[in-house]
């Protein structure tokens, strides 16, 4: 712990999840199962898309990158949380904390841009079907992913460098299960005005703008469906956009609940629980949402399994 009211720190203490000590073993088993499901489920989607040529389309190109990002995003926080629960240790080094901040922001930001790219892909597929292959070219898809990585890397680097310059802290006890930037800034006795201003500014670009783009895309999709109302058209739109809408609702629902309805108490238990939703639960559910009732994914899985069985 800290020896004075203001000093430098070499490590932080992560208080973890708001659970009783006697329940640690149960929650460890639960979160380990969820993390393994996240990794294996998303890896399966990546492999199926790579192995089946019928899935080499813009939609599945973005989905494979989203699956990789989900694995990475969950891996930033879950292994350390599980290790702390297993060893009953709560410490993380200052360097480890800085690294966690960077990669958390990196993959979280990429998630936003990939979901936006997928919404645009669905918009073009439904609203401009005749020009779909021309608009959604391979070069555009690669460019969108590259821009997502470049901007997300810059965003994470800016926040990380601004945090690293903070030298004095009133306390080193973090009321979270990972190094959450907002929770860490509350502990600093240095001036965090610039940090908070940059967070607000970049949050508009990273969260608000992509969310608005997604809403606009689905607004146009809805208008297109209403102009040509038919059971077949509605079913096609639902099968095409339903899974993506579910993922967007889960992801942005958690973010809106966390940042637009913040906790009024100091323990921030609600913030920790909501963080579990978008760092552990949502990445785990995404493979099930995208594969459930998805004939292309299910067909690719059956084809791959039958090939493996026949080879033996």
Swiss-Prot record:
Instruction: State the Gene3D superfamilies in the record.
Output: Rhodopsin 7-helix transmembrane proteins (1.20.1070.10)
Report the SS bond pairs.
none
Kindly give the Pfam families that the UniProt entry links to this protein.
7tm_4 (PF13853)
Alphabetized, the UniProt keywords read: Cell membrane, G-protein coupled receptor, Membrane, Olfaction, Receptor, Sensory transduction, Transducer, Transmembrane, Transmembrane helix
Has UniProt tagged this entry with the keyword DNA repair? no
- Asked if the Swiss-Prot or TrEMBL record annotates the protein with the keyword Transmembrane, the reply is yes
- Residues annotated as coiled-coil are none
- Chief subcellular location equals membrane
What is the recorded membrane topology of this protein? Multi-pass membrane protein
Locations listed in the record: Cell membrane
Q: Which GO terms describe its molecular function?
A: G protein-coupled receptor activity; isoprenoid binding; olfactory receptor activity
Q: Which residues cross the membrane?
A: 29-49, 58-78, 95-115, 143-163, 197-217, 241-261, 272-292
- A Gene Ontology BP annotation from the UniProt entry: sensory perception of smell
InterPro entries tied to this protein: GPCR_Rhodpsn, GPCR_Rhodpsn_7TM, Olfact_rcpt
Its GO CC terms are: membrane; plasma membrane
Q: What does this protein do?
A: Odorant receptor. Activated by (+) and (-)-carvone.
What family does this belong to?
Belongs to the G-protein coupled receptor 1 family.
Q: Know the name of this protein?
A: Olfactory receptor 1J21
Q: What broad taxonomic lineage does this protein's source fall under?
A: Eukaryota, Metazoa, Chordata, Craniata, Vertebrata
